[in-house]
Amino acid sequence: GALKDAISKKAAAADPSVGDIVLPTATVELDGKELSEADSAKAMLFAINKFSQTHGDFTISDLTDGYQSMLEDTRERIVAFKKTIAQGDFQAVFQPIVDIRTRALHHHEALVRFPETGADGSPYEMITFAEEAGVIGDFDIAMVKKVIATINAGKKVGKQVHAAVNLSGKSLESPLFIQTLLNILKDCRPIRNHLMFEVTESSRIDDLEAANKVLQELHKLGHHVCLDDFGAGAAAFQYLRALEVDFVKIDGIYVREAFTTPNGKIFLTSMASLCKELKIQTVGEFVETEEVARFLSQVGVTYGQGYLFGRPGGL
């Protein structure tokens, strides 16, 4: 309602990544007590959205202790997340992606592990929260920097590291994020063909035309781009039509369903065929058996990723 609209405008006005206003980058005190004005507005908007999901539409008079508690929890989570990112208190692990026919290594996907989830824990909940709360851009930039450092470290000892970094669709909608990313990449000329990007479909991209312009900028700099989680969301084919990408990673659920549902192989075959017609290379996820690898090869999937070829780990 009107309350959410007002707070959305407040977040936009305070956020240096929105509109034509460019303010200093938002900061957070690492003692866990303070948020920037922009992040405070984001916390309010996130809490209101969650509150309205369980309480329906409401007015200021409806903001009970339940909402206040939710808001405080959201603020604390944002502070903790930004502190984790600022201190680099997370680990990048790498999972191999190989040629499905020759099994030759093509590149690795860089994945994150947070201390809270353990070495093998999924970061899904924390990443989803960061996207919904509007603070995912900070993490994406930190991850890009960490992977670039890994590539450079390998180069110094004669090791060729090729890696893909995930970028949230939400990040691609932030002008500040885009400018920060491009500034970082301008200093990476020697390793540009070693670094590629995966655009995740976990968060809907509203302005596909603007997002595609970002991808074109990445292409101009010499980076390949992959559309991740293809088929996971309702807008998958809309993304494929609007975004100029070099690779498509078919969501793992379709790989698994190829062997568990009557029409699973038909859907997977159709996806692979469509991408081949568009001259886009494909990656199949969740490859855990030779049977799956053989089928992917038969239907024209180019690359494979999964436990059959290696678990996420160090390089």
Mark where each language-model region is.
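Catalytic core of bacterial c-di-GMP phosphodiesterases, primarily the EAL and HD-GYP domains
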Residues: 27-34, 104-109, 135-210, 286
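Catalytic strand-loop-helix junctions within cyclic-nucleotide turnover domains
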Residues: 18-40, 66-69, 96-102, 114-118, ...
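EAL-family c-di-GMP phosphodiesterase catalytic domain
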Residues: 49, 101-104, 114-119, 168-175, ...
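Catalytic-core segments of nucleotide cyclases and related cyclic-nucleotide turnover enzymes
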Residues: 8, 29-56, 124, 230, ...
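Active-site core of bacterial EAL-family cyclic-dinucleotide phosphodiesterase domains
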Residues: 65-129, 166, 227, 284, ...
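Catalytic core regions of nucleotide second-messenger enzymes
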Residues: 9-26, 119, 155-161, 189
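Alpha-helical scaffold within the catalytic cores of cyclic-nucleotide enzymes
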Residues: 2-16, 43-45, 143-152
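C-di-GMP signaling machinery
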Residues: 34-91, 101, 129-136, 169-171, ...
